[in-house]
Amino acid sequence: PISLCAINFRVDDNLGYLIRSAACFGAERLYVVGHVPERRRISAASGTLIDYVEIVQFSHPRDFLEHAKKEDLHVVAAELDERARPLSSHHFNFDRHLCLVVGNEESGVPPEIMAAAEILYIKMPGVGFCLNTSHTANIFLYEAARQYEDLESYNPILPVNSRGAQLVIKERKGE
């Protein structure tokens, strides 16, 4: 019951790492708002796991939000924001499909998605104030998967992509 959403990533490897993490933690799909690089540009970072995650592309944040509303996704954004609550004390609700959102490496999560999302941040006691966006996604995925695993319904079997070696990309524009 977990998906990821990457917003306008600038660095192809970050998207590749996100695909790898999504597959490792059992995320069903990766929504990408903006550009999806060619398979060859992200396959090194994603490894052989690129075939286990469905990638759904949206041109604009509003298109993703329309889809999220239609699918009744519980959107949770990772962002440093005054409205954000710490991930460490958050309990995810799995009554609805959970979609974890990470933003652009420089500009973060767009305001329109922030307005529609629950906002969380990662407490960091060290000298840095923010992590690489793919690292942030890893921590959010780990915590969501850990909490879900604590439920009796956890099933660690990964879905098999029936499309073989193809990168699965679906573009959706204003549904």
Residue ranges and their predicted role:
Residues 1-175:
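Post-transcriptional modification and biogenesis factors for structured RNAs
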